[in-house]
Design a protein with these regions (language model features):
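Interdomain hinge/linker elements that couple catalytic modules in large macromolecular machines
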Residues: 145-323
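Short regulatory helix/loop adjacent to the ATP-binding pocket of P-loop NTPases
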Residues: 121-137, 151-153
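Hydrophobic anchor at the beta1->P-loop junction of P-loop NTPases
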Residues: 22
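Short glycine-rich substrate-engagement loop in P-loop NTPases that contacts/grips substrate
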Residues: 53-82
């Protein structure tokens, strides 16, 4: 599968004197991006194999190279002339004192360094902080629907059914039955993600943690916080899990790129509201596997997929809140997504269907209360031709939104 969006980011950042840090959930294709796609690009542009130093640190055979002094000596021994060397380190967080190693590599005048990592606690936070102005992060998401469709083709609605059930981890494409796909996703939780989180955080109660993950999977698109989740455990699960532990567990999930938090934003007051947030899964197949594929609700999943699509396009995405006042009451209306990038902003509603005027009014109510000039978009599941409604809002179909990345600019 071509991953041109990310490959172009790597190509444009060549020789920029920064460490290129490719982050993303385990099994999302980081190694393939660097060791295959980027490697092939280097060869095609005339770089010789002996000037590409590649080390997969999660390979047992390279266990000795997780020692900082050993790996630095290994790299220095392979640099034998003044030509430029491309150094590619996969799962760099497995090196002891890896920030010191990266600092040392920055001092090699004829080296261009690329690393991958699958834990943001060690990477996005530590590395980007440690290498202020010297680190260039590229976040790799699982396959988008467009990447999948452009590679596989076929009936887009049949592919959509598969996508909203099994998600976009590249390993899914190698499996030829629904049973195998479901088993693969379930096993990833046990053998990869949970194992990583237990090891990195010295987690004692893995079942308690998995139970919280299942709760998060069942409430995508719902506003929550540790206090609300604590009450859920008491009332629904008849279990005690205090908010401090819940907050810690949520940070573990975010650090492993399993989930992302979208904060609530007061549109008119132009400030964040710190009480409740929404959480979305970076891969919808992993979310469904947590629930044994029992709650595959297309409307909620569609909202999650739209969130992921906006994020991979580079937007910061918040949940918008706007106040509606009448003579009798004041109530908060929600805008599903406030998507920001530089001076661009879009207000977006995910509307699975608008079968009647009441539903249409419900979806439009919050957008009507926003009095600025940024574009307001309602995305429907139906395959419709994009149009403006009487309010000046843009109504687009889900397929157009997912398959035409320039559509929002063109509306």
């Amino acid at each position: 599968i071509k991953r041109d969006y990310y490959l172009q980011q790597l190509i444009s950042s060549k020789s920029n004197n920064l460490i290129k840090i490719v982050t993303g959930i385990r099994r999302s294709g980081k190694s393939f991006l660097l060791f295959n796609l980027f490697h092939n690009h280097l060869i095609e542009t005339g770089i010789s194999e002996d000037h590409i130093i590649e080390i997969a640190l999660d390979d047992r055979l390279n266990k000795n190279l997780r020692d900082p002094d050993v790996i630095l000596q290994h790299i220095h021994e392979r640099i034998v002339d003044d030509k430029l060397y491309y150094i590619i380190l996969d799962e760099v967080q497995m090196i002891d004192e890896f920030t010191d190693v990266l600092n040392s590599l920055l001092h090699i005048r004829n080296a261009d360094v690329y690393v991958t990592g699958s834990n943001s606690k060690f990477l996005s936070k530590d590395v980007v902080t440690e290498f202020r102005g010297r680190g260039d992060e590229i976040h790799l998401f699982p396959l988008s629907f467009a990447e999948l469709y452009n590679s596989i083709g076929g009936d887009k609605f049949e592919l959509w059914k598969s996508y909203y059930t099994y998600g976009g981890l590249p390993g899914i494409l190698e499996l030829d039955s629904e049973k195998k796909k479901a088993a693969y996703l379930r096993s990833l939780h046990e053998t990869v993600y949970l194992k990583d989180i237990i090891e990195r955080n010295n987690l004692k109660n893995s079942e308690e943690f998995m139970e919280l993950m299942r709760v998060m999977a069942s409430c995508i698109g719902s506003s929550c916080n540790p206090s609300k989740l604590e009450n859920t455990f008491k009332s629904v699960k008849s279990e005690t899990l205090d908010r401090k532990t819940i907050s810690k567990y949520l940070s573990y999930m975010e650090d492993a790129f399993l989930i992302e938090k979208s904060m609530r934003y007061d549109i008119k007051g132009r400030k964040y509201i710190g009480t409740l947030s929404k959480y979305y899964f970076q891969d919808i197949g992993l979310r469904n596997a947590l629930l044994n594929f029992r709650q595959v609700e297309e409307n909620h999943i569609m909202e999650n997929v739209i969130y992921n699509e906006l994020r991979l396009r580079g937007f910061c995405v918040d949940v918008g809140m706007v106040e509606a006042r009448t003579a009798k009451e004041r109530k908060q209306l929600e805008v599903d997504f406030v998507a920001n990038m530089a001076d661009r902003r879009y207000y977006i509603q995910s509307a699975f269907a608008m079968p009647d005027d009441d539903k249409r009014e419900q979806e439009c109510a919050s957008l009507k209360k926003i009095d600025d000039s940024f574009k307001k978009i309602i995305i429907m599941r139906d395959d419709i031709k994009p149009y403006h409604d009487n309010n000046g809002f843009y109504i687009v179909g889900l397929m157009d939104f997912l398959l035409k990345p320039d559509l929002m600019e063109q509306l």
